[in-house]
Amino acid sequence: MSKINLFSQIISKLDRPSFNKLVLEKQTDKHSKGYDSWTHLISMLFCQFSGCQSVRDISNGLRSATGNLNHLGVDLAPSKSSISYQNQKRDWTLFQEYYYALLTHMGNLSGKQRTKFRIKSKIFLLDATTISL
């Protein structure tokens, strides 16, 4: 079995057709050259999950994983200026609507998988709270 990192596992759960539909509705990729909305989303998710503090951190982090970007649907790691420009100019409502679409999609998936369970044995809890003296 091949090793897949946590970031690519999370990205694989994203509903790409739903995202592409929103991109066509909003026309956010109309004038983009190489840095499309999907790459923007991947860049911002990478920023959140890796704890990046600056645009330079995002750009350098994605460049260090250049070989793995193809599996995420990203052709080329974005430059600092591209990330900065698209953060200012791209319509943020695309990502807001995609969040709610993804929330609905994932909620429907999890609703079917819920099972009731009962714990039959005693559960012992240990409180590790520190008390200052």
Question: Model segments located where?
Answer:
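Short alpha-helical elements
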Residues: 1-133
